[in-house]
Amino acid sequence: MQPLLRQVHAAVAWLLVGSIVVQVWLAGTAIPQFGGTGNFETHRNVGYLIGLVALVLVLTAIPTGLGRRRILQSLGILGLYIVQSSLPYMGVNAIEALHPVNAAVMFVVSLVYARAVWRDRAATAAA
């Protein structure tokens, strides 16, 4: 059962990475200087769905048997998401401006994590 759970977990990790790429694209299409309307509603709504993916990442990490380290790493990604969704509402422009910076950090951390759990999955399948 664990090999299947590890495959599901790896797929969720890659889904998160892909979702972040789509989210950045949605933000770019809304920016008026790039021809957008200035309406970030779709970007915001999809962002909330990404939170569900991040939560599923944590929930699927627990039964995989990959250990405490992977569970804590997935919790860290969820933490980055919580920060990400809070930044636009801080009320201080200098802090709100960290929203795209945190998005980049979340993307890199999620990408590194997805690659690692993909390798973990492959190692389990080969054994």
Locate predicted features:
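Polytopic transmembrane helical bundles with strong interfacial aromatic enrichment
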Residues: 1-127
